[in-house]
Curated annotation (Swiss-Prot):
Part of the 30S ribosomal subunit. Contacts proteins S4 and S8. It comes from the Bacteria. Residues 50-113 form the S5 DRBM domain. Keywords: Ribonucleoprotein, Ribosomal protein, RNA-binding, rRNA-binding. Gene3D superfamilies: 3.30.160.20, 3.30.230.10. This is Small ribosomal subunit protein uS5. It comes from Prochlorococcus marinus (strain AS9601). Transmembrane segments: none annotated. GO terms for cellular component: small ribosomal subunit. Residues 38-50 have a biased composition (Basic and acidic residues). One of its GO terms (molecular function) is structural constituent of ribosome.
Length: 206
């Protein structure tokens, strides 16, 4: 039968194991700090590409059993000015929380916009949401963004520099922003249209 080691023998073996030196601990701490800095810098680069603009903040109330519950509603437009834009709505008990929820909601509802070399849109488009209708059409270089209100914010954060927009119907900021998003989502490039119709670009322009 083999002799089982006693507690004193096990303790003596553990005592003989060399512990990490202070120099090694410092090196490990430095490596961990470098990794954390790299991760933070990557996250900052990703977040720096996106811009956020608050279109409207309203104080709303909800009738519950105990009375009225007050909260804030924020309409936020998020975009990277490179062809991606989104509109979000957030509700919270404070303004900062409502804006934060609106930003996260806007990033969940992003739309890709095909941009021309002149930072305009390829074709005319009409979008509607509720009683709001928004008409957007391409413009020549140097025209700028001819739009107002929440429609202008959506177009600017999408990266469009030359465009004409017309608001038809309702004047509410949320409906107009969503109508502009619908109009942008319906845009298609000339190549995609010619591919769907089975004709060349020359035949499409003629």
């Amino acid at each position: 039968m083999t002799d089982t080691p006693t507690k004193q023998e096990i303790q003596s073996k553990n005592d003989n194991v060399p512990a990490a030196t202070p120099v090694e601990q410092k090196k490990n701490n430095r490596n961990d700090r470098k990794r954390n800095r790299r991760g933070d810098s990557k996250n900052l680069e990703r977040d720096s590409d996106w811009q956020e603009r608050v279109v409207q903040i309203r104080r709303v109330s909800k009738t519950v059993k105990g009375g009225k519950k007050m909260s804030f509603r924020a309409i936020v437009v998020v975009g990277n000015e490179k062809g991606q834009v989104g509109v979000g709505v957030g509700k919270a008990g404070d303004v900062i929380g409502a804006v934060r929820k609106g930003v996260s909601d806007g990033k969940k509802n992003l739309v890709r916009v095909p941009l021309t070399p002149n930072n305009s849109i390829p074709t005319l488009s009409l979008g509607s949401d509720g009683a709001a209708n928004v008409l957007i059409r391409p413009a020549a270089p140097g025209t700028g963004v001819i739009a107002g209100g929440s429609i202008r914010t959506v177009l600017e954060l999408a990266g469009i520099k030359n465009v004409l927009a017309k608001r038809l119907g309702s004047k509410t900021p949320l409906n107009n922003a969503r109508a502009a998003m619908v109009a942008l989502s319906q845009l298609r490039t000339h190549k995609s249209v010619s591919r769907e119709r089975g004709i060349s670009l020359e035949q499409l322009y003629s």
